[in-house]
């Protein structure tokens, strides 16, 4: 799997028109896109279907969490849409229900561990006694036990997570920032090079590409950095 299959560009824009222009600008350089709530609520599900039909891969970032039956029903419908990845919060019952619902569909289910915008203070405020690292590892183990296809975590935890989940699960890391980039609202960040070296399989990059003066140049620079991290292993 090369850099192009590993880079996921976050379409974190408010309208379908802006998303269409960005996809057109990035052209064949980018294969994989993330679509989340912002775009979904602007009509993004139909846009996601169209992108998938055109040959792009779609990571639908819905972070589902509900009672088992509701999660299963939602996953069954999403599995029919041609999406490549879907997120849900890494709670054991929800994950098990989702895995059963997605069986045989080819949809890769990802368990969200701890948001990269959260640190220990944020977790404490939310009532958690564990630090981010410990909670990520616990939820990664639960995701593996549930039969999930991968997890979402900070690249800071990727190496430790790999030891828990084994060699086959995807490790998808947001909070990717090239050297010199503004962190924005992210708190646990890493460069593309370091994230891949730490064991991430896929990198989610939004603002450093979307908000760049030339998004295509920004994407190509990140892809080049990723290639250098993968060489000579070419994983």
From Swiss-Prot:
Q: What does the UniProt keyword field contain? A: Decarboxylase, Lyase, Pyrimidine biosynthesis
General function of this protein: Catalyzes the decarboxylation of orotidine 5'-monophosphate (OMP) to uridine 5'-monophosphate (UMP).
Which residues does the record give as substrate binding sites? 12, 34, 61-70, 116, 177, 186, 206-207
**What does the annotation say about its assembly with partners?**
Homodimer.
Q: Which GO terms describe its molecular function?
A: orotidine-5'-phosphate decarboxylase activity
The cross-references to SUPFAM superfamilies, in alphabetical order and at most eight, read: Ribulose-phoshate binding barrel
Q: Reaction catalysed? A: orotidine 5'-phosphate + H(+) = UMP + CO2
Associated pathway: Pyrimidine metabolism; UMP biosynthesis via de novo pathway; UMP from orotate: step 2/2
Q: What is its EC number?
A: 4.1.1.23
Catalytic residues as annotated in Swiss-Prot or TrEMBL:
63 (proton donor)
- Name the SMART domains on file: OMPdecase
UniProt name for this protein: Orotidine 5'-phosphate decarboxylase
| SS bond partners | none
In its UniProt record, which GO terms are filed under biological process? Answer: 'de novo' pyrimidine nucleobase biosynthetic process; 'de novo' UMP biosynthetic process
